[in-house]
A protein has these predicted regions:
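Active-site proximal beta-strand in glycosyltransferases
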Residues: 44-50, 56-77, 94
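N-terminal pre-catalytic "stem/leader" segment of glycosyltransferase-like enzymes
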Residues: 1-56, 292-305
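A charged, aromatic-enriched C-terminal amphipathic alpha-helix characteristic of glycosyltransferases
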Residues: 249-302
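Short alpha-helical segment that forms part of, or immediately flanks, the ligand-binding pocket
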Residues: 178, 201-205, 219, 224-226
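Short hydrophobic beta-strand element within catalytic cores of glycosyltransferases
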Residues: 209-212, 232-235
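Conserved catalytic-core segment of nucleotide-activated headgroup transferases in glycan assembly
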Residues: 103, 120-177
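Acidic donor-binding loop of glycosyltransferase active sites
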Residues: 182-195, 216
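A short, active-site helix/loop in glycosyltransferases that binds the activated sugar's phosphate group
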Residues: 90-112, 147-149
Length: 305
């Protein structure tokens, strides 16, 4: 069994597919040469950001499309159109989360292939609990939100004598994030919408409970000047979204409004030792489970080693 990956992918999705292939004893190959696709010594074709019609490759080839085609689909995209009955058993497009599927369907009537919410697996071996000393009550992660929300959170944490460290999204390396996770009792996540939310889920994989200041829509994401990124759609679309695409009460607490922070924070602190976020991850978000679900949708029967 062999998977051929053609075209650009976000490094985290690529890493997930590569590890998943190892888990399932599937050979992985990357190419940026289009003609390579037509040498049919492989079984699965992954196209993260390119549309290639299933009719242009051998019929025995299974195809995974996505997730990097667009922010919002448009009617002129070649993947958009009535569902093709001849293709639906051998290929699909993954948006990674239900809210993303719903937004896509709000912009176009249908895709020519099934559009599914199939997340990519996490590296639970790397993102795992360890015995590091917990020196922070909270790691505060801030990503693309109104700065007033961050300042309010800081004021609340300080008023409760909490020790915390702030990570501004885009200003740190992955290893730094992992190191700080392991030194923290919990994470206060003040972020935007997430198609999957690898970093959110990696905290859970480390068994670090999350206190999430969740979003209701894409309109809560702002640029460096505090202007909503998706302002052109205000009054035209709802753009309903979430920060946490996979969630359970054992992962922590979620709130939406500033006035909910103090009470939710107190609940979180009181219940801190009762959360088991890694248990949720191991049940739902491992490479074996996530890639296994993709294989099942392609009618490929393989067991992870």
């Amino acid at each position: 069994m062999k998977l051929l990956h053609y075209g650009w992918s976000h490094p985290r999705n690529k890493e997930s597919i590569m590890i998943s292939c190892i888990k399932f004893n599937i050979e992985y190959e990357y190419t940026d040469v289009l003609d390579r696709i037509h040498t049919y010594d492989y079984n699965i074709l992954w196209l993260p950001c390119n549309w290639i019609s299933p009719d242009s490759v051998a019929k025995h080839i299974k195809i995974i499309y996505g997730p990097h085609f667009c922010v919002f689909p448009t009617s002129d995209m070649p993947i958009v159109g009535p569902l093709n009955e001849d293709w639906k058993e051998r290929c699909f497009f993954t948006c990674m989360s239900d809210w993303n599927v719903n937004i896509y369907k709000d912009f176009v009537d249908s895709f020519k292939v099934p559009i599914l919410a199939l997340p990519f697996g996490l590296d639970t071996d790397k993102f795992c609990p360890d015995k590091s000393e917990k020196i922070y009550d909270f790691l505060v992660v801030f990503k693309g939100r109104n700065r007033n929300e961050l300042q309010y959170s800081i004021d609340v944490l300080q008023s409760m004598n909490m020790k915390f460290h702030i990570l501004m999204w885009g200003s740190f390396h992955h290893e730094e994030y992992l190191n700080l996770l392991r030194k923290s009792k919990g994470v206060l996540w003040i972020g935007t919408h997430e198609s999957q939310g690898f970093a959110v889920q990696e905290a859970l994989s480390c068994n670090i409970p999350l206190l999430v200041w969740n979003v209701k829509s894409l309109f809560q994401e702002v640029n460096s000047e505090g202007i909503p990124e998706y302002r052109d759609y205000i009054g035209k679309k709802d753009l309903i979204a979430t920060t946490v695409t996979s969630w359970d009460s054992i992962c922590g607490e979620v709130f939406y409004e500033a006035e909910e922070l103090i009470d939710t924070l107190q609940i979180f602190v009181n219940k801190l030792t009762t959360y088991s976020p890694r248990k949720f991850v191991l049940k739902n978000l491992t490479h074996e489970i996530c890639f296994g679900n993709m294989l099942k949708k392609l009618n490929i029967q393989l067991e992870a080693s």
